[in-house]
Amino acid sequence: MNSKPCPDCDGGGVVTRREFLKTSITTAAAAAAAPLVLPGSVAGAGAKAARSETIVATLYKDLSEAQRKAVCFPFEHPLRSKVDNNWHITDKKISEFFNKDQQAMIKEIFLGLHSPEYAQTVYNQVEHDGGNAGGFGGTSIALFGEPGTGKFEFVITGRHCTRRCDGDSVAGAAFGGPIFYGHAAKGFDEKPDHPGNAYWFQALRANEVFKALDGKQRELALLGDARGEKGTDTVKLTGKKKNLPGIPMTELSRDQKDLVKKVMADLLAPFRKADSDEAMKLIEKNGLDHLHMAFYKNQDVGKDGVWDVWQIEGPAMVWYFRGDPHVHVWANIKAKA
């Protein structure tokens, strides 16, 4: 990511709370895709769409001093780069600590981080998996730095949720740092076909790659035990171009490589275009031929030969899909390890 300040988050790009509340915020995916339009007095000629970063700036300005003390931290605070599968970055639930207007802003920020096609599906997943803790309202947020200074990041966390909104403040990191998503659609222990799971389509696409491999290639790709889940260390980058787990892309034909690219497209599909484009740019910069893809037979739910656990790893990226007993997905993509 570029380290330059985000123009939408500087003074002229901050929509006021009153102006924000004049816009319609709905739960539909179409609304998630529809940008908030700033009045001409704020946006200037040819009013431009407000991004999630702009709403973060509006939210920041609307916080009381007591709220800032609880959820705002220096930009370099270590919590900013943490990721886990079920955690709260602060002990302040959205539904209890923020007023209704602020809750609406937080929801809009979250929706805006995702693509129009998947925003509502992803929101529903967080709402479902956070059910016992209050659904989406049971998540928590933190803001690091200050919008408009060139160094800030908004982080939202909960069960099966770590997302970031950084306005390009975190240089060389897709999504502003490591992210996590997951789903336990029909219970903690999902059936082999993971019915209703929001992200299982990604594993089905990955299994198309395995089906296209010949016997020798499968020997390279199919391994025993996958990596453990260890919080932020789960997606620790190695910087290695060779001898990573699984089959290197150099061992694949052009058609097989095209299938891997389709997997990458599906992995990035739930996220807003700016983030997915940047992620792919960083991966390509480090060399697609340095990627390795691995499948893990010891965590095959239902023993059906459809691999529930797999990963793609390169010198400065890890995308780890763990579908046993339900879906956990960890991702970390940088310019360099």
Q: Where do the PLM segments sit?
A:
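N-terminal secretory signal peptides
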Residues: 1-19, 34-35
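Signal peptide processing junction and immediate N-terminal pro/mature segment
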Residues: 37-45
